[in-house]
């Protein structure tokens, strides 16, 4: 029965994901118009869909807890140390409690970061909120607000991670990593010699799979803090690096522009996506940016601890050094 349900779920997911490319053919056309466009693409309709992933993970988590205490614990209890038996209930509750707190706490603490003139520009108004966009912020169509010091919209929490809930997010992430890694390592060591009951094997596969995912994601977050950037800013830096590789990013008197070659010659545009004006730089001594060393990340303090403090401490001063001498 469980295998049939899994096969059905995988089939439906495949039909939905393939629908955009094969929408000219039935049944993909039905999945595209009825499911993909109305449920997935439209951010305002069927908002219950955003709770599907948290509900799925909550169900898996609850199933693992039931499997452990209902089927597995009796098999491995003798192999557990006494302190483990005392700590396990708290260790099981902590990730769930931290996750609920992170999901319920909005990222709404204002930030006063400086505009670097490359990724973020002053004078830009959010087209949805109709307010001035702070530097390092991002508008989330799912949450319906601009998020200060925005990192990403976490589908597992159905909440944006940003200034105001970084601490709870990191706490939930750390608690999950600790519990899942412990379980993935400890279950095989505590398994009865010479046999693996079906429940124990199922629990080990689930715990180990989620442990790998959780540890990988934690490592990416640690790397972002080290580099003084967010997931949102990392995506912007990828676009900047692509412009450098193509030789289209130029600078003049501390400002950055894109050089675009077309049928009418070369035109220059601001790196501000909201500024659609063309700039006359043909006779100006502009320089082509060819190395990331020419455009340092002004939001990176150079200290992992200070970068982390900017996220965790609502009173921390956001790094305000500006690019000079460009």
Swiss-Prot record:
Q: Which residues lie on this side of the membrane: Cytoplasmic?
A: 23-49, 107-164, 220-326
Q: Transmembrane region positions?
A: 2-22, 50-70, 86-106, 165-185, 199-219
Membrane topology classification: Multi-pass membrane protein
GO CC, alphabetical: actin cortical patch; actin filament bundle; endoplasmic reticulum; endoplasmic reticulum membrane; Golgi apparatus
Location of the protein in the cell: Endoplasmic reticulum membrane
Give me the Lumenal side stretches, as residue ranges.
1, 71-85, 186-198
Residues in domain DHHC? Answer: 124-174
Q: What is its EC number?
A: 2.3.1.225
A Pfam family of this chain? DHHC
Q: Which GO terms describe its biological process?
A: cortical actin cytoskeleton organization; establishment of cell polarity; protein targeting to membrane; regulation of exocytosis; vacuole fusion, non-autophagic
Catalysed reactions, as listed in the record: L-cysteinyl-[protein] + hexadecanoyl-CoA = S-hexadecanoyl-L-cysteinyl-[protein] + CoA
The answer to whether UniProt assigns keyword Cell membrane to this entry is no
Recorded superkingdom: Eukaryota
Q: Which GO terms describe its molecular function?
A: protein-cysteine S-palmitoyltransferase activity
Q: Which residues form a coiled coil?
A: none
Q: Cite the entry's keywords alphabetically.
A: Acyltransferase, Endoplasmic reticulum, Lipoprotein, Membrane, Palmitate, Transferase, Transmembrane, Transmembrane helix
Q: Does the keyword Ligase apply?
A: no
Q: What's this protein's function?
A: Palmitoyltransferase that targets several endosomal SNAREs. Palmitoylates the SNAREs at cysteine residues close to the cytoplasmic end of their transmembrane domain. May have a role in the cellular quality control of transmembrane domain-containing proteins.
- Family according to the record: Belongs to the DHHC palmitoyltransferase family. SWF1 subfamily.
What the record says about its domains?
The DHHC domain is required for palmitoyltransferase activity.
Q: Specify the protein name.
A: Palmitoyltransferase SWF1
Q: Which organism is it from?
A: Eremothecium gossypii (strain ATCC 10895 / CBS 109.51 / FGSC 9923 / NRRL Y-1056)
Gene name in the database record = SWF1
